[in-house]
């Protein structure tokens, strides 16, 4: 979603929220939470508050009028009823064949509510220097995590990675073969954005940056001489990220056509642009997701930009066997997150088994 549209959506949600959620929002801006995270949390709060009113737990006529003491006095049984509502709600939708929302969605909802409750019961201060209330019902609510070993998760992910020669084969496919299947009209659209699309894919495969980090790149953040980019990580921290040299020609070719192709002026500082009716704009995350999905599906298997991040991490670990180096490249504070890649690159284990 474009930053401008994202901020508009956030304002729409803020306009209907109770005062204590607005307090929470303002506090988390100072952390800072990303606008994307806050937007997702506000969506979850609306869903929760709608349920409070519909279920009769709150007699407020609208979300903005929900009182703080409603949250204070919610019971564990109330929260379990809400979780059950989430599981059953899609079955009420005649257009859905699913029996309930995924556990991942439920966990995301509960995570958003836990953050709000922690703020209200621990972090905020009233006039007396005390939190608004002390009873945190979310501490009594258990989340159910998907049961899957790292080895199982690694095997599932491995099928969606472009490892070894496939990294360059994917880029070559988009560069030289993809358009051969297109109609003249589709080919014209592809050729307009070809250099940009290749540059985006190459950057993701060569750096492992998150989708949001690529979207928010500005011209000043990219140093092609040193092959280093400056990104804003989760939590608002700035970080320097090395980029593999194979991405350089793709980035250079894009920069050669960027200004003329996308009608960019000096004030258009976004690195990756779109152009509509002569007006350049920063490309949004959904456009990149669709683009990566389209090309990858035609090449081998439909993947997300995050799988390209996994591809870089796996290739880097395979080359270095260093979880520390991989965690630094990805912007993780701990090597625990990179344990997954040791299971994807498990040739030594398989070779040992073959010798038995």
UniProtKB/Swiss-Prot annotation:
Q: Which residues form the signal peptide?
A: none
Question: What is the activity regulation entry?
Answer: FtsK is required for recombination.
Where in this chain does the record put each Tyr recombinase domain?
A: 169-354
Gene3D superfamilies for the chain = 1.10.150.130, Intergrase catalytic core
Q: Tell me the Gene Ontology biological-process terms attached to this UniProt entry.
A: cell division; chromosome segregation; DNA recombination
User: Which InterPro entries would you find in this protein's record?
Assistant: CB, DNA_brk_join_enz, Integrase-like_cat_sf, Integrase_catalytic, Integrase_recombinase_N, Integrase_SAM-like_N, Recomb_XerS, Tyrosine_recombinase_XerCD
**Core-binding (CB) domain: which residues?**
16-121
Q: What SUPFAM superfamilies does the entry give?
A: DNA breaking-rejoining enzymes (SSF56349)
Show the coiled coil region(s): none
Residues of the active site = 210, 234, 306, 309, 332, 341
The entry's cellular-component GO terms read: cytoplasm
User: Keywords on this record?
Assistant: Cell cycle, Cell division, Chromosome partition, Cytoplasm, DNA integration, DNA recombination, DNA-binding
Which GO terms of the molecular function aspect are on file?
DNA binding; tyrosine-based site-specific recombinase activity
Write out the annotated subcellular location.
Cytoplasm
User: What does the UniProt record say this protein does?
Assistant: Site-specific tyrosine recombinase, which acts by catalyzing the cutting and rejoining of the recombining DNA molecules. Essential to convert dimers of the bacterial chromosome into monomers to permit their segregation at cell division.
Give the family per the record: Belongs to the 'phage' integrase family. XerS subfamily.
Name under which the protein is recorded: Tyrosine recombinase XerS
Species whose genome carries this gene = Streptococcus uberis (strain ATCC BAA-854 / 0140J)
Tell me what gene encodes this.
xerS
């Amino acid at each position: 979603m474009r930053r401008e549209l994202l901020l508009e959506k956030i304002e729409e949600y803020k306009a209907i929220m109770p005062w204590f959620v607005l307090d929470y929002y303002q506090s988390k801006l100072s952390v800072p939470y990303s606008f994307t995270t806050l937007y997702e949390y506000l969506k979850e709060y609306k869903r929760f508050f709608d349920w409070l009113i519909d279920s009769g737990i709150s007699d407020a006529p609208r979300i903005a009028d929900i009182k703080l003491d409603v949250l204070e006095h919610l019971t564990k049984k109330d929260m379990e009823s809400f979780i059950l509502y989430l599981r059953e709600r899609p079955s009420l939708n005649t257009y859905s064949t699913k029996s309930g929302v995924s556990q991942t969605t439920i966990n995301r909802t509960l995570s958003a509510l836990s953050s709000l409750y922690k703020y209200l019961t621990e972090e905020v201060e009233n006039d007396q220097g005390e939190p608004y209330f002390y009873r945190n019902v979310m501490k009594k609510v258990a989340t159910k995590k998907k049961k899957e070993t790292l080895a199982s998760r690694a095997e599932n992910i491995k099928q969606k990675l472009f490892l070894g020669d496939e990294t360059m084969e994917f880029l070559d496919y988009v560069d030289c073969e993809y358009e051969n299947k297109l109609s003249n009209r589709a080919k014209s659209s592809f050729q307009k954005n070809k250099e940009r699309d290749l540059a985006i894919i190459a950057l993701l495969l060569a750096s492992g940056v998150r989708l949001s980090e690529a979207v928010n790149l500005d011209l000043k953040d990219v140093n092609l001489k040193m092959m280093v980019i400056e990104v804003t990580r989760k939590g608002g921290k700035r970080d320097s990220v090395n980029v593999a040299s194979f991405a350089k020609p793709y980035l250079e070719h894009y920069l050669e056509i960027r200004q003329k192709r996308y009608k960019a002026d000096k004030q258009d500082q976004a690195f990756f642009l779109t152009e509509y009716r002569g007006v350049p704009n920063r490309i949004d995350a959904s456009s990149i997701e669709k683009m990566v999905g389209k090309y990858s599906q035609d090449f081998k298997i439909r993947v997300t930009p995050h799988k390209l991040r996994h591809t870089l991490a796996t290739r880097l670990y395979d080359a270095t066997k260093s979880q520390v180096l991989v965690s630094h490249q990805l912007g993780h504070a701990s090597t625990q997150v990179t344990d997954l890649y040791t299971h994807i690159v498990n040739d030594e284990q398989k070779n040992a088994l073959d010798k038995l």
